[in-house]
């Protein structure tokens, strides 16, 4: 996937994607470098003057001294929040987050439930979760990005209706390297933004809630 500097900068240099990282903050490096979310850890930390805490075999040892954690729910589930008193911000993505895990961490830190495939530059929606909320959503599009919930004919669906989520805006990557057939299948001109903008077919199912949040409801190819 051809991800551009512009794509990455749009996530890291705007909030909430910047995760409030400040000079001197410690960000735990928990993820495999082959995973796109590792770029969020590494580049997000260094861009804002933070200190990257390189892990050994013990993830908790790195998390214990960190202010910010970025992880998949599976990785995060192996870390006890009580063992990480410094942590003030947590972001998860890469797979659906169990509600109990979100509630447990949100009681101690700013907890962001996020969503987005590699083709939309790590994540393109984020939600700061409140344990008292009725739903655990994937939130709203991050700055300069859009999400369209469309029917099979690529027409927008009303609030509450389930459809396929297409991503638009600054997050949309430049396509697959040397794969025109797959590019034609997954990328399309964005009729809503117009011009040279393109949108990406995520194959994720979702719907808008009445208060403008996105609910993730699985995959079209499950």
Regions inferred by a protein language model and the residue ranges of each:
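Surface-exposed loop/turn positions
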Residues: 25-26, 50, 67, 95, ...
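Gly/Ser/Thr-rich phosphate-binding loop
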Residues: 47-50, 70, 80-137, 146
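Conserved AMP-binding
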Residues: 21, 31-35, 118, 169
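AMP-dependent adenylate-forming
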Residues: 8, 110-113, 128-222
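Alpha-helix capping/helix-boundary segments
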Residues: 58-59, 75-76, 97, 172
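Conserved AMP-binding/adenylation subdomain of ANL enzymes
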Residues: 1-26, 35-67
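His-Asp-centered acyl/peptidyl-transfer active-site segments
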Residues: 22-23, 27-29, 39, 83-86, ...
